[in-house]
Amino acid sequence: MGSKSSKSSGFENVPSLGLSHTNQPRVSLIREARPSLYGRYNCKCCWFQNKNLVECSDHYLCLKCISSMLRRGQNCEICGKPIPTHIAVTTAPTAPPEP
């Protein structure tokens, strides 16, 4: 309500994502990577994270790397396709169901 600006969120330089358009399909967030025949799934950008991964065409990216790439542009630096910006977060129960 005043002329003072609020705290910086750190996303001032992120390009507009057009979140009002809902025609882009939602990509699911993978909370914990599944083991595979060839080892575990990792973020293809940093090769470290194996939790909170998002599938981008044929590989996975962690949320930190996606945020970093979105600051520089809207296309993935690995495959060149648009970075998924609509993520469906599934809710997991925090406690076992009551008997």
Swiss-Prot record:
**Motif interval(s): PTAP/PSAP motif:** 93-96
Give the record's membrane topology: Lipid-anchor
Protein's organism:
Oliveros mammarenavirus (isolate Mouse/Argentina/RIID 3229/1990)
Q: Which family does it belong to?
A: Belongs to the arenaviridae Z protein family.
Q: What is its main location?
A: virion
Q: Which UniProt keywords apply?
A: Host cell membrane, Host cytoplasm, Host membrane, Host-virus interaction, Lipoprotein, Membrane, Metal-binding, Myristate, Viral budding, Viral budding via the host ESCRT complexes, Viral release from host cell, Virion, Zinc, Zinc-finger
Modified how: Myristoylation is required for the role of RING finger protein Z in assembly and budding.
SUPFAM superfamilies hit by this protein? RING/U-box (SSF57850)
Q: Where found, per UniProt? A: Virion; Host cytoplasm, Host perinuclear region; Host cell membrane
Which gene holds the coding sequence for this protein?
Answer: Z
What interactions and quaternary structure are annotated?
Answer: Interacts with protein NP; this interaction probably directs the encapsidated genome to budding sites. Interacts (via RING domain) with polymerase L; this interaction inhibits viral transcription and replication, Z partially blocks the product exit tunnel for the releasing nascent RNA product. Interacts with the glycoprotein complex; this interaction plays a role in virion budding. Interacts with host eIF4E; this interaction results in eIF4E reduced affinity for its substrate, the 5'-m7 G cap structure.
Region: Disordered, residue numbers? 1-21
Q: Where are the transmembrane segments?
A: none
Q: Which Gene3D superfamilies match?
A: 3.30.160.310
What are the BP-aspect GO terms?
viral budding from plasma membrane; viral budding via host ESCRT complex
> Which top-rank group of organisms is this from?
Viruses
Zn finger spans (RING-type): 43-79
Task of the protein: Plays a crucial role in virion assembly and budding. Expressed late in the virus life cycle, it acts as an inhibitor of viral transcription and RNA synthesis by interacting with the viral polymerase L. Presumably recruits the NP encapsidated genome to cellular membranes at budding sites via direct interaction with NP. Plays critical roles in the final steps of viral release by interacting with host TSG101, a member of the vacuolar protein-sorting pathway and using other cellular host proteins involved in vesicle formation pathway.
Which Gene Ontology terms cover its molecular function? RNA binding; zinc ion binding
Its recorded name reads RING finger protein Z
Lipid-modified residues of type N-myristoyl glycine are: G2
